[in-house]
Amino acid sequence: MQTNLLKPKIISVEALTANQAKVVMEPFERGYGHTLGNALRRVLLSSMVGYAPTEVAIAGVVHEYSTLDGVQEDVVNLLLNLKGIVFKLQSRDEVIINLRKEGPGVVTAKDIDLPHDVEIMNPDHVIAHLSAGGKLDMQIKVEKGRGYVPGNVRQYNDEATKIIGHIVLDASFSPVSRVSYAVESARVEQRTDLDRLVMTIETNGVLSPEEAIRQAASILVDQLVVFAALESSEVSGDLAPSRSSMVDPMLMRPVDDLELTVRSANCLKAENIYYIGDLIQRTENELLKTPNLGRKSLNEIKDVLAARGLSLGMKLESWPPANLEK
């Protein structure tokens, strides 16, 4: 009797548009099409890294319910239009860019003054309409992130450093616009009870649909490898590792995997903190003594660790493990 599960392979990747593709994978054992299709779809929609405007300061505007003379849109619609711009940062995690234009005319994304390593994927996106005498002068902060972060959450976290007149935006970082999947019947030789998984993926241009599904699969593998590392309780004698010698694989991952800001990451490396296991053993007071690492960076580190069920000041009995690369 056949006991090995069939391993699927990608049959075809069909480009429907510049940013949309259909990926067909088969064969799957019966039921695995829905199992993996749903998991991939959820990861694609929630866990892809992208870029979004997170904060804006507009000359003459104190809050989002204001209006500007000579600008057709009110500030609320202006902010909605700003959030529709698709940014791509090449070598940094955040940037502050400027937009200055006088009317009459249409203000589009290509009017933004960009550094050499920042790209706009939809330069014709309309931001505002200016009449004669109208003027638009703003600073936009763009950051790297994952998923969706409401503005009020970011505002509370940054309350101590908030500047009057700076408007915090809801940030949708995900570069994946739409994902759908369908499961069809497939056949291999005499077996007709197999699944074919058809996924349709649309992105905003920051990454291709093919790259998106590769990243989603890597995230799933990275999450599931922890379960594969579980030791059987039936192993006994010298073959059974002691509880104290077993280290959570999460702690052996580099701090770069936490996706901290460049400033925070560089401060940690300057203190020879290369792994998550190194980091969680430090206390808040120890980190605050690190040059250039302030309260804001400390809060960022604490939030990132908390999202993974970790915290500062933890004790590890068997750290560093013998197999940890120096």
UniProtKB/Swiss-Prot annotation:
EC number, UniProt record: 2.7.7.6
Protein's name according to its UniProt entry: DNA-directed RNA polymerase subunit alpha
Stretches the record annotates as Alpha C-terminal domain (alpha-CTD): 247-326
UniProt xrefs under SUPFAM superfamilies: C-terminal domain of RNA polymerase alpha subunit, Insert subdomain of RNA polymerase alpha subunit, RBP11-like subunits of RNA polymerase
Gene Ontology annotations for the cellular component aspect, listed alphabetically: cytoplasm; DNA-directed RNA polymerase complex
Quaternary organization: Homodimer. The RNAP catalytic core consists of 2 alpha, 1 beta, 1 beta' and 1 omega subunit. When a sigma factor is associated with the core the holoenzyme is formed, which can initiate transcription.
Classification via Gene3D superfamilies: 5' to 3' exonuclease, C-terminal subdomain, DNA-directed RNA polymerase, insert domain, RNA polymerase, RBP11-like subunit
A molecular-function term among this protein's GO annotations: protein dimerization activity
Organism: Polynucleobacter necessarius subsp. necessarius (strain STIR1)
Pfam families, sorted: RNA_pol_A_bac, RNA_pol_A_CTD, RNA_pol_L
Keywords: DNA-directed RNA polymerase, Nucleotidyltransferase, Transcription, Transferase
Domain notes: The N-terminal domain is essential for RNAP assembly and basal transcription, whereas the C-terminal domain is involved in interaction with transcriptional regulators and with upstream promoter elements.
Renumbered residue ranges of the record's region Alpha N-terminal domain (alpha-NTD): 1-231
Name of encoding gene: rpoA
Top-level taxon: Bacteria
Stated role: DNA-dependent RNA polymerase catalyzes the transcription of DNA into RNA using the four ribonucleoside triphosphates as substrates.
Reactions it catalyzes: RNA(n) + a ribonucleoside 5'-triphosphate = RNA(n+1) + diphosphate
